[in-house]
């Protein structure tokens, strides 16, 4: 059976609730379809949803399990969960079945819509931008010192100053992220990956 056969099999649950239930399970948290918006349920358990339109390479860089929306030959939408990614093959969960499929096969049915969960390190809600004074800056400074060895002794510690911005830009360049000094979702996820934050599911092994 190919991917199309599984998509057209009406006995396999391929709805968003099935996909969210599997995704929440990978993160070790609880999902109840009858309790409302899944992203609100995630937030209540210290996770955030991130819904994007992008490429497989972008998902590889994020290195988090992702729900993809696939469109079959009849135009019907189906949700699958990508649990592992290699160079040319993905492991997906479709309903309760695990399949290894080529990225080429996925590309025939996928137009780029995906959703991931990620775990913010602190309770700050907004991006960290140069010049801001925020509790999240303390986390950023400490995290980069662990990852890169670059120590910024700026006082006050919660002020995002010029030295820290330079370290952030260097880090973003190394990670092939947008080099703008703004610590948004992608930069925070990259930092969490390098820190190997406990209880975080990855798509591929960390080198």
Predicted segments with their positions:
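Short acidic, glycine/serine/threonine-rich helix-capping segments at coil-helix boundaries
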Residues: 128-135, 142-194, 200-206
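Extracytoplasmic glycan-interaction modules
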Residues: 1-7, 56, 121, 151, ...
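Extracytoplasmic/secreted envelope proteins and their assembly/folding machinery
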Residues: 16-24, 65, 79, 103, ...
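Short beta-strand-centered aromatic/proline hotspots
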Residues: 78-84
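Cysteine-nucleophile protease catalytic domains, especially the papain-like/related folds used
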Residues: 1-67
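Structured segments of extracytoplasmic/periplasmic soluble domains
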Residues: 22-33, 56-62, 69-72, 88, ...
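Noncatalytic regulatory segments and standalone regulatory/sensor domains
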Residues: 8-12, 63-71, 89-152, 159-161, ...
């Amino acid at each position: 059976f190919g991917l199309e056969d599984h998509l057209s099999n009406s006995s396999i649950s391929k709805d968003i609730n099935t996909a969210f239930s599997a995704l929440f399970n990978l993160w070790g948290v609880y999902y109840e379809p009858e309790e409302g918006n899944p992203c609100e349920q995630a937030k209540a358990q210290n996770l955030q949803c991130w819904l994007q339109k992008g490429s497989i390479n972008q998902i590889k860089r994020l290195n988090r399990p992702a729900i993809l929306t696939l469109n079959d030959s009849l135009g019907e939408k189906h949700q699958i969960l990508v649990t592992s990614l290699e160079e040319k093959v993905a492991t997906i969960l479709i309903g309760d079945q695990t399949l290894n499929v080529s990225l080429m096969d996925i590309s025939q049915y996928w137009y780029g819509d995906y959703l991931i969960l990620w775990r913010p390190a602190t309770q700050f809600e907004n991006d960290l931008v140069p010049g801001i004074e925020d509790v999240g800056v303390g986390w950023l400074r400490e995290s980069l010192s662990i990852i890169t060895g670059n120590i910024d002794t700026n006082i006050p510690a919660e002020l995002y100053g010029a030295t820290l911005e330079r370290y952030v830009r260097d880090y973003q360049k190394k990670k092939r992220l947008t080099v703008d000094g703004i610590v948004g979702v992608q930069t925070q996820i990259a930092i969490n990956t390098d820190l190997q934050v406990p209880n975080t599911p990855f798509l591929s092994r960390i080198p």
